UniProtKB/Swiss-Prot annotation:
Cellular component aspect of the GO annotation: cytoplasm
Annotated binding of Mg(2+) 1, by residue: 248, 260
UniProt keyword annotations, A-Z: ATP-binding, Ligase, Magnesium, Manganese, Metal-binding, Nucleotide-binding, Protein biosynthesis
Record-annotated ATP-grasp domain positions: 104-287
Organism whose genome encodes this protein: Pseudomonas fluorescens (strain Pf0-1)
Family in the record: Belongs to the RimK family.
Protein name: Probable alpha-L-glutamate ligase
HAMAP family in alphabetical order: RimK (MF_01552)
UniProt-listed InterPro entries: ATP-grasp (IPR011761), ATP-grasp_RimK-type (IPR013651), ATP_grasp_subdomain_1 (IPR013815), RimK (IPR023533), Rimk_N (IPR041107), Rp_bS6_RimK/Lys_biosynth_LsyX (IPR004666)
Binding residues annotated for Mn(2+) 2, in chain numbering: 260, 262
Amino acid sequence: MKIAVLSRNPRLYSTRRLVEAGTERGHEMVVIDTLRAYMNIASHKPQIHYRGKPLEGFDAVIPRIGASVTFYGCAVLRQFEMMGVFPLNESVAIARSRDKLRSLQLLSRRGIGLPVTGFAHSPDDIPDLIDMVNGAPLVIKVLEGTQGIGVVLCETATAAESVIEAFMGLKQNIMVQEYIKEAGGADIRCFVVGDKVIAAMKRQAKPGEFRSNLHRGGSASLIKITPEERMTALRAAKVMGLAVAGVDILRSNHGPLVMEVNSSPGLEGIETTTGKNVAGIIIEHLEKNGGPNMTRTKGKG
């Protein structure tokens, strides 16, 4: 197969590993800088151009689209889909999962466990919003944030009111969530490929920190997940319509709660922690499921 990898940086660990794994299995791997691809949309034959030449003959595309380029990245990926190129994750599923609020609304509709979450526009509704999520301590999240940036833990209702007012004053869209104390600053990253959780790791926040992101100094370790956690991760990825996803789960007193479904999960942490060839498993999934003109939309909403 001729496989495109949409990535801003060919030197990133995840991009490098996918290229290595694909090459090892006999595929032609081509890394394309997402922002340098441009499109002829209105022609009868949809095209993508790259560095002055049309991109042709691709069987599949692996999107590694960073959060900051979601809009343009999804447009490029959609154009590949219009050309009949099979996407590992489709554009509509990536857009769905990148919208934190929309993704929680869709997960909630399917009865998947979530932390109690509130969303409001008017400062007049702040006290009621805080009560809605069972009061302080609570977590405030900027909807556009990634890697733990724009996430604040407020220990008291007074602090929460001040922080929410400040974000609203800056015209930032935020959501307010209950703080799951019993998780102890840890979450579980379940790596889903197709209809299997192929690997899982526990991410523990460093002392004095509640965000467990590895980018914020968190540590990763092997973990055995429960059947309920496995089923929750698989259902969450399916609701989003994602074939490959990193599903972040908290262990709470009332079962597993989904924090986020990541459409472009990093490979370094999970491969290093588990010793599994995750990149190879992803390429195998493409071989089994991918092919020209197999671009039917998955997921709803």
